[in-house]
UniProtKB/Swiss-Prot annotation:
This is Small ribosomal subunit protein uS3. One of its GO terms (molecular function) is structural constituent of ribosome. The keyword Ribosomal protein applies. Residues 38-106 form the KH type-2 domain. One of its GO terms (biological process) is translation. GO terms for cellular component: cytosolic small ribosomal subunit.
């Protein structure tokens, strides 16, 4: 069933941590709905900032939001003006104090969310989907990934009948729980309808115990940080060389 299930949810509690870190009581449903609203708002508001992951932590009176992005300067703005503005906007959504941390993804080519969204934007910009996919595969493998698999589905090239095409290079062992597999599904809106884009990236294998809680080690409301566990840079991370 490793081929069917979402690779991220399949590894929760093993080598992958949760994106919402808090304990809920009777208000669990309200907090969950609030998290959904925050993520939906941020993904729409920061569509051009190459956002990879949004981690939400809660205390009684404070909501801490960590945004992982490949373009932190867009979110921070000049002198932090954009962050302050974003904080005020989110206060209206949650009615609680907001703290925003910015974490820079230093190798966006190894992040499935960023890769999938980049392909989708290129396809919407009328770039040939095969060219966009092959460029993404080449860039990802050049950055040291063990393997990548990309599937695109829909009315490709305006065909009357929808079909799926898959492109892959290297290895993506979905049944191996210690394999660090990143996954994302994105959509591209074209004149002939929606195209679905799925991306799997194997960043190596994790040996030994891995800290499941997000390890964002940069200062608050800054755009600099270590590579962390989000894009394959944890201290227990090892790579195997592929002879291609």
């Amino acid at each position: 069933m490793g081929q069917k299930v979402n690779p991220i949810s399949n590894r929760l509690g093993i080598i992958r941590g949760w994106d919402s870190n808090w304990y809920g009581g009777n208000d669990y449903g309200d907090s969950l709905l609030e998290d959904s609203k925050i993520r939906k708002y941020l993904n729409a508001r920061l569509a051009k900032a190459s956002v990879s992951r949004i981690v939400i932590e809660r205390t009684l009176k404070l909501v801490t939001i960590t945004v992982c992005t490949a373009r932190p300067g867009i979110i921070i703005g000049k002198g932090g003006q954009e962050v302050d503005k974003l904080k005020e906007e989110l206060k209206k959504v949650t009615d609680k104090d907001i703290q925003i941390n910015i974490f820079e993804v230093k190798r966006p080519e190894l992040d499935a969310v960023i890769v999938a969204n980049n392909i989708a934007r290129q396809v919407e910009g009328k770039i040939a989907y095969r060219r966009a996919i092959k460029m993404a595969i080449a860039n990802t493998m050049r950055m040291g990934a063990e393997g990548i698999k990309i599937q695109i589905s829909g009315r490709l090239n305006g065909a009357e009948m929808a079909r799926s095409e898959m492109y892959k290079e290297g290895r993506t062992p979905l049944h191996t729980f210690r394999a660090d597999i990143d996954y994302c599904h994105a959509e591209a809106l074209t004149k002939v309808g929606l195209l679905g884009i799925k991306v799997w990236i194997c960043r190596g294998e994790v040996f030994g115990k891995r800290e499941l809680a997000p390890n964002f080690t940069q200062s608050k409301e800054s755009g600099r940080g270590n590579n962390g566990g989000n894009n394959g840079g944890g201290k227990n991370f090892k790579r195997k060389k592929n002879n291609r």
